């Protein structure tokens, strides 16, 4: 629906954006930093990070030219995301720099003896870490700060490259779930942008979510769709909320999800992705144990300095064992069990 017609939601979105922006403003002022460096991809997360950084610079009275947007195309970059990244940077009045990383990544593959035709985790993470190295070095060049783009959903699932996009100097999206990222970007587009910028932002909202680390298909379209690989974010964000905020066990989360998403996902699909959620949430904790600073936006956070302190070698066996037993609707669960 048209978010401009929902004043209540608009107030919520504005508060959430303000928390992110004022958090970054405080860090910029504390460090006397006049420059920010962002890897801009044309995807949702880097777009929200850029919008937040623009707001923070405006609040500080710093010229937007101090926001250095770096686009780093490689094997999987599509025209759609590249063009949106370039257009949005120019529309917002930020500085743009393009660094094609293909040559550097190929040299790296040659150095370590990796076949470029083998599209495995080494192939993907090599690109992500090359990008992070560039951002960090440009931050040194400009006396700037690398702004992290990863969101809460990605961190919960470990859908980030360790010491790649996982790392920054201040992560503005770390407590914002992916489903909310999309709504925030759309709200800004509908309420706070001129016509050209609005069109760019709405196209970004409608672009399939992808890290673009695998080459595009024969038509130049995104081949690597994140939700095909790890599952729908609306399910994972649902699981995450009721697991962290309410402390519910897998059977109750399954019960609630089966009814909430009835007609959208059948129970076998929900069970499949619930298993993925618990497996990944536990075995990816090591990435969350060393997260950069960032603001807490909503009611849950997985910062090791805040809401969530968990050993990296914690076992998921008990939770996964319960997921395996799920086969019927859990009507025996007490209806009065609610969030505290």
Where are these regions (language model features)?
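Long hydrophobic segments that form regular secondary structure
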Residues: 16-18, 22-23, 29-33, 138-155, ...
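Secondary-structure transition/capping motifs at alpha-helix termini
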Residues: 27-34, 55-67, 77, 87-99, ...
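A conserved beta-strand->alpha-helix junction
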Residues: 62, 66-122, 128, 154, ...
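A phosphate-binding catalytic loop at a beta-strand-loop-alpha-helix junction
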Residues: 20, 28-60, 253
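Intrinsic disorder and flexible/low-complexity segments
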Residues: 251-333
């Amino acid at each position: 629906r048209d978010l401009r017609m929902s004043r209540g939601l608009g107030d919520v979105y504005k508060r959430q954006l303000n928390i992110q922006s004022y958090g970054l403003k405080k860090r910029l002022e504390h460090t006397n930093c006049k420059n920010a460096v962002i890897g801009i991809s044309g995807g949702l997360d880097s777009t929200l990070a850029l919008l937040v950084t623009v707001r923070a610079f405006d609040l500080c009275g710093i010229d937007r030219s101090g926001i250095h947007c770096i686009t780093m195309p490689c094997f999987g970059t599509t025209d759609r995301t590249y063009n949106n990244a370039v257009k949005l940077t120019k529309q917002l009045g930020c500085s743009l720099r393009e660094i094609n990383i293909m040559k550097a990544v190929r040299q790296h593959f040659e150095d370590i003896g990796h076949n470029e035709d083998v599209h495995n985790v080494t192939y993907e993470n090599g690109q992500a870490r090359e990008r992070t190295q560039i951002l960090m070095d440009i931050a040194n060049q400009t006396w700037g700060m690398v702004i992290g783009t990863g969101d809460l959903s990605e961190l919960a699932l470990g859908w980030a490259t360790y010491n790649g996009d996982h790392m920054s100097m201040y992560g503005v999206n770390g407590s914002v779930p992916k489903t909310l990222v999309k709504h925030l970007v759309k709200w800004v587009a509908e309420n706070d942008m001129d016509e050209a910028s609005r069109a760019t932002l709405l196209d970004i909202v409608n672009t399939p979510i992808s890290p673009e680390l695998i080459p595009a298909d024969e038509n130049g379209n995104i081949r690597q769709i994140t939700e095909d690989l790890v599952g729908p974010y609306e399910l994972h964000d649902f699981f995450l909320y009721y697991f962290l905020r309410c402390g519910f066990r897998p059977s109750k989360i399954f019960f609630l999800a089966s009814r909430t998403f009835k007609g959208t996902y059948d129970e076998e699909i929900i069970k499949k992705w619930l298993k993925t959620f618990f497996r990944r949430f536990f075995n990816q904790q090591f990435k969350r144990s060393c997260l950069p600073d960032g603001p807490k936006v909503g009611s849950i956070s997985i910062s090791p300095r805040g809401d969530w302190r968990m050993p990296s070698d914690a076992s998921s066996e008990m939770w996964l064992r319960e997921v395996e037993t799920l086969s019927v609707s859990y009507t025996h669960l007490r209806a009065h069990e609610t969030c505290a």
